[in-house]
């Protein structure tokens, strides 16, 4: 696993030990970032269920201003910290070991701005059934209620291939859906209101 492009292009990343995380392949990340390209410069990024931090670190390498990394798994937090130290990106980011499904005021973006890019790469079990997908939608609604999302923010939800997106998250419009091997990426844009 490596940084695909930007100021840290080609730098290797470590992944958390164990079977809890499923790092996104370089090919899938490259395709995702080709889609998100125009949204990355000066972005304020929220990387939920961050695992190794590869998604958020890639945005920082490509010109994002700030990234908040959130994961409840101590091995994931450790891997993200190691990668951030290796890339010398600690000043442009913060790592929080918390449950991403329960956002509170601790998750707000610095300076009162809203996040412009949100990554949600939860365990597949959360996207596998309606109850888990509902919990993710409630998380997105809570982020909006807390004022954490900028109008027009772009969000990516990763799910196992074949998992239907019953409906976009509250306040979001689905604008793209891509499947790569066993992974489907749902891309949504925040409209600025809850539906």
What are the residue ranges of the model-derived segments?
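Class I S-adenosyl-L-methionine-dependent methyltransferase catalytic core
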Residues: 1-195
């Amino acid at each position: 696993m490596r940084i695909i492009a930007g100021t840290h292009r080609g730098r290797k990343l470590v992944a958390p030990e164990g079977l809890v995380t499923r790092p996104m392949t370089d090919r899938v990340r490259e395709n995702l970032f080709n889609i998100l390209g125009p949204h990355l410069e000066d972005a304020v990024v929220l990387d939920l269920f961050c695992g190794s931090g590869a998604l958020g670190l890639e945005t920082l390498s490509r010109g994002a201003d700030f990234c908040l990394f959130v994961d409840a798994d101590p091995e994931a937090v450790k891997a993200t910290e190691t990668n951030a130290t290796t890339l010398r990106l600690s000043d442009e980011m913060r790592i929080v070991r918390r449950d991403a499904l329960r956002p509170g005021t601790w998750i707000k973006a610095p300076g009162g701005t809203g996040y412009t890019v949100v990554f949600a790469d939860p365990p597949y079990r959360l996207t596998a059934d309606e109850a888990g997908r509902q919990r993710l939608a409630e998380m997105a609604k809570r982020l909006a209620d807390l004022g954490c999302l900028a109008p027009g923010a772009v969000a990516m939800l990763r799910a196992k291939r074949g998992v239907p997106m019953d409906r976009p998250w509250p306040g979001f419009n689905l604008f793209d859906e891509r499947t790569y091997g066993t992974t489907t990426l749902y891309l949504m844009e925040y409209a600025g209101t809850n539906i």
